[in-house]
């Protein structure tokens, strides 16, 4: 049986992208909206296209994604991560180019927690000698 839908998840900070790839013409739908409509001016289109261009599958798959959490910039990065992992499901031979481009690696940087007895994660309360 040939699979016609490929699923993967991508993450960045607190953003989670659930991504489905189906054979198509290259449309990208995010939370039932077009990407330019959902992301607005901060839209980083090149990040979403990079996994497809790396694997020579540009405009061969339609993307349907649901995004939750985080800000818009983190959501774009999570979407690119999810697309990369879904492309890996379509063809295991995509692993080498995606890995060389660094698209399969999850960005582990997250906000550092606030510590008690301090103003923030690193900032201290003002110190007075007298």
Swiss-Prot record:
UniProt xrefs under Pfam families: Ribosomal_S9
Keyword Ribosomal protein attached: yes
GO biological process: translation
Ranges where the record places region Disordered: 109-130
Molecular function per GO: RNA binding; structural constituent of ribosome
One annotated Gene Ontology cellular component of this protein: cytosolic small ribosomal subunit
UniProt keywords, alphabetically: Ribonucleoprotein, Ribosomal protein
InterPro entries from the UniProt entry: Ribosomal_Su5_D2-typ_SF (IPR020568), Ribosomal_uS9 (IPR000754), Ribosomal_uS9_bac/plastid (IPR023035), Ribosomal_uS9_CS (IPR020574), Ribsml_uS5_D2-typ_fold_subgr (IPR014721)
HAMAP family listed in its UniProt record: Ribosomal_uS9_B (MF_00532_B)
PANTHER family for the chain: RIBOSOMAL PROTEIN S9 (PTHR21569), SMALL RIBOSOMAL SUBUNIT PROTEIN US9M (PTHR21569:SF1)
Family listed: Belongs to the universal ribosomal protein uS9 family.
Full protein name: Small ribosomal subunit protein uS9
Annotated organism of origin: Desulfotalea psychrophila (strain LSv54 / DSM 12343)
């Amino acid at each position: 049986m040939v699979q016609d839908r490929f699923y993967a998840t991508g993450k960045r900070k607190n953003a989670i992208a659930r991504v489905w790839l189906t054979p198509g013409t290259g449309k990208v739908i995010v939370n039932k909206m077009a990407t330019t409509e959902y992301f607005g001016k901060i839209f980083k289109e090149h990040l979403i296209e990079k996994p497809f261009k790396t694997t020579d599958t540009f405009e061969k798959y339609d993307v349907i994604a649901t995004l939750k959490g985080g800000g818009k910039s983190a959501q774009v990065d999570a979407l690119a991560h999810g697309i990369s992992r879904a492309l890996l499901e379509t063809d295991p031979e995509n692993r080498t180019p995606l890995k060389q481009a660094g698209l399969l690696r999850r960005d582990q940087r997250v906000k550092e927690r606030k510590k008690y007895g301090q103003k923030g994660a690193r900032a201290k309360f003002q110190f007075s000698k007298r």
